[in-house]
Amino acid sequence: MIRQSLMKTVWANSSRFSLQSKSGLVKYAKNRSFHAARNLLEDKKVILQKVAPTTGVVAKQSFFKRTGKFTLKALLYSALAGTAYVSYSLYREANPSTQVPQSDTFPNGSKRKTLVILGSGWGSVSLLKNLDTTLYNVVVVSPRNYFLFTPLLPSTPVGTIELKSIVEPVRTIARRSHGEVHYYEAEAYDVDPENKTIKVKSSAKNNDYDLDLKYDYLVVGVGAQPNTFGTPGVYEYSSFLKEISDAQEIRLKIMSSIEKAASLSPKDPERARLLSFVVVGGGPTGVEFAAELRDYVDQDLRKWMPELSKEIKVTLVEALPNILNMFDKYLVDYAQDLFKEEKIDLRLKTMVKKVDATTITAKTGDGDIENIPYGVLVWATGNAPREVSKNLMTKLEEQDSRRGLLIDNKLQLLGAKGSIFAIGDCTFHPGLFPTAQVAHQEGEYLAQYFKKAYKIDQLNWKMTHAKDDSEVARLKNQIVKTQSQIEDFKYNHKGALAYIGSDKAIADLAVGEAKYRLAGSFTFLFWKSAYLAMCLSFRNRVLVAMDWAKVYFLGRDSSI
């Protein structure tokens, strides 16, 4: 019985041994005593040394080791996939496909209408990107030959973002469309709604020309100019923050003031004036620039000029009782409390009455007159119509507002009989604010509008060539049905974002019926992610991300 038990034990473990070692153990068990065989089986050294090398048995890995290997592989594959996606996206943007050329007629003989777009801002570019440009002869007229990503413009004067990272050439945008687009680097200065013509003047250097352009449809998206509210001295002594040239000018003034102040004695009152930076306007542009300026002083200038950086004063002047009035009160209070912590001097209920070369004269909420000395003054408040918009207003009776071009619910210019549309900051309509988000959605809406307008034009052409009354009736029904599908423009507010300094941001979000209020460092990451996603091209996203990484590791570039 004992020997049989031993044999069963040997055979039960025989899978662990090779054939030779198996037969050897059986023979050994038959010829030796039970105790000797048992001792052999219990001798771990013999089993490990003589049997293990021939078995191929692998020890089971721990859960954490297996998980670690899987995670490492997943990260590696993700990095490879991400690199491939980035490379492909950049290649696709740099190598556009062949475009359909412009022509006077379509293959069926119907007329191809001309659509002229004035401007290269948010509304105009949104229309151009979403429009099927094969349906019209599309012409873009703008004195600025690039699109500017304005939400990140306040980051550029102090070097957080480089200007080249937030611009995209108009010709590049136009070249990526399916149909050919003509572009004129020129400024429209007169529109004739009666004869449907536009007078433009070249803004290109060494290439002056005047040109008359005919249109069937005209979209005015020329934006707005800064509104000084008639305050004396603003145009002469302050800097605005709407264009690349404005950011470059502010950067030059900041660096010049700092260098001049460094050459003066700390007790000199002129030094204190030069180191006083004043921002007028408590909207997103003014708030974000003040925050960026404070960050530059605290995070960069303090390293290289520690004593001087302590003397720099940032002041934000706002005529209303609060800054960022489009945000929820909780977020407004959060931003104002943070500004106090950052030592940004908030002057609320303070209205600027006059500006001279060194001082702002302002009226406080108590009615007192206060003089605020400054070294650099940035005016970031209010919009006013441009000259071409003012000119157009005088030619249409219905245009009786000074705040902007009046439009209906389909973005058609009042009094223009359906041939002129207006979008963006150059317009005025109750409930629509002069923001990039509004202009972007207006551009998307018009792209769909013109798609349906093309369909109606084609149905009308077919109706004029119909052979019998039944076909005419059928086409009329289709026209009525298509016209009924053109809905009014409805703005979908998705929320508002603002950077408030010290790597913190606020977000007032609307998702369906729900509303969310976010504030803090996590919101700053969301702010970055949202603006990266909103960048016009993949190239812009890469450059902006690299700028942020550069600031994190190397600091801001303060050179001019």
From Swiss-Prot:
Gene3D superfamilies: 3.50.50.100. SUPFAM superfamilies: FAD/NAD(P)-binding domain. It is an enzyme of class 1 (oxidoreductase). The lineage of its organism: Eukaryota, Fungi, Dikarya, Ascomycota, Saccharomycotina. Its main location: mitochondrion. NAD(+) binds at residues 275-311. It comes from Saccharomyces cerevisiae (strain ATCC 204508 / S288c). It is found in: Mitochondrion intermembrane space. Residues 1-41 form a transit peptide. GO terms for biological process: glycolytic fermentation to ethanol; regulation of apoptotic process. The keyword Thylakoid does not apply. It comes from the Eukaryota. GO terms for molecular function: NADH dehydrogenase activity; NADH:ubiquinone reductase (non-electrogenic) activity; oxidoreductase activity. GO terms for cellular component: mitochondrial intermembrane space; mitochondrial membrane; mitochondrion. Present with 4930 molecules/cell in log phase SD medium. External NADH dehydrogenase required for optimum cellular growth with a number of nonfermentable carbon sources, including ethanol. With NDE2, performes the mitochondrial oxidation of cytosolic NADH under these growth conditions. Regulates the mitochondrial glycerol-3-phosphate dehydrogenase, GUT2, also involved in cytosolic NADH oxidation. InterPro entries: FAD/NAD-bd_sf (IPR036188), FAD/NAD-binding_dom (IPR023753), NDH-2 (IPR045024), NDH2-like_C (IPR054585). Its EC number is 1.6.5.9. It catalyses: a quinone + NADH + H(+) = a quinol + NAD(+); a ubiquinone + NADH + H(+) = a ubiquinol + NAD(+). This is External NADH-ubiquinone oxidoreductase 1, mitochondrial. Belongs to the NADH dehydrogenase family. FAD binds at residues 114-144. Keywords: FAD, Flavoprotein, Mitochondrion, NAD, Oxidoreductase, Transit peptide, Ubiquinone.
